Amino acid sequence: MAVQQNKKSPSKRGMHRSHDFLNAAPLAVEPSTGEVHLRHHISPNGYYRGKKVVKTKND
């Protein structure tokens, strides 16, 4: 097993962990309907980039 040679200081420990956080998923607004959805996903009404791509129950 690997064993550290010297103790890592709190500053170095913090620098090591500086990228271990989560980001909120970016949201997009559908231009034709104004709905909010995840980027690169279709909106709840079946629109993607202003075009109807999936039939929904309401259609």
Swiss-Prot record:
GO terms (BP aspect): translation
Which cysteines pair up through disulfides? They are none
Q: How far does the signal peptide extend, from start to end residue?
A: none
Q: Where is this region: Disordered?
A: 1-25
Q: Which residues form a coiled coil?
A: none
InterPro entries found in the cross-reference section? Ribosomal_bL32, Ribosomal_bL32_bact, Ribosomal_zn-bd
A Pfam family in this protein?
A: Ribosomal_L32p
Recorded GO MF terms: structural constituent of ribosome
Q: Name one cellular component (GO) term.
A: large ribosomal subunit
Query: Which keywords belong to this entry?
Result: Ribonucleoprotein, Ribosomal protein
Q: Which family does it belong to?
A: Belongs to the bacterial ribosomal protein bL32 family.
Name of this protein: Large ribosomal subunit protein bL32
